[in-house]
């Protein structure tokens, strides 16, 4: 698989994840009804609830100064208000734009294993190229090792581990390159067990030079919005779309 194919695969995976979240939201709210609680120049409010149950029930409130959702999906507040309206919550860019308007304290984050591993793959490949002085050995390296890393490089993780294991196994103790490949092998083994942000940050801080991350390694983003938070945003988005559609029907009647 070449770089373009890998990039397209990454895009396809992202779209599949988004579709799965939309389907989940639709299933969770399939019986919901959307009732207007307030409709004034100062306040717009809706109750999003299925009959005879409070499961996934929540209210959406919009004032001049902000938007809030409260209820069975855990409360969230946004730093935009009536000028954006319910149409803002009904937008299509959920993971970036809608998320970007959350109040800071609502932006829950978690470890991004793919981003962490992608950074290591790119850095380690750079180190391998710089430390492979023999032209024949360099030519024998896979194309993906010699190319600059990019989106989807986390998918090379197992391939990189296999490559380093194989190269290290062919070099006897005391031979040229033994210490280099041994250290890479040890670091990749350690990195495979890392599963939270603080642990990854300490690891990168201690080994940024050996991993080829550069002195600005601290700028590498290794966390992402919490998965459960994004799922809640999809629930809110689904409800907002239903409310917008309901308003359009009322105007057309």
Region roles according to the model:
Residues 7-70, 75:
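Short N-terminal edge-element motif at the start of the domain
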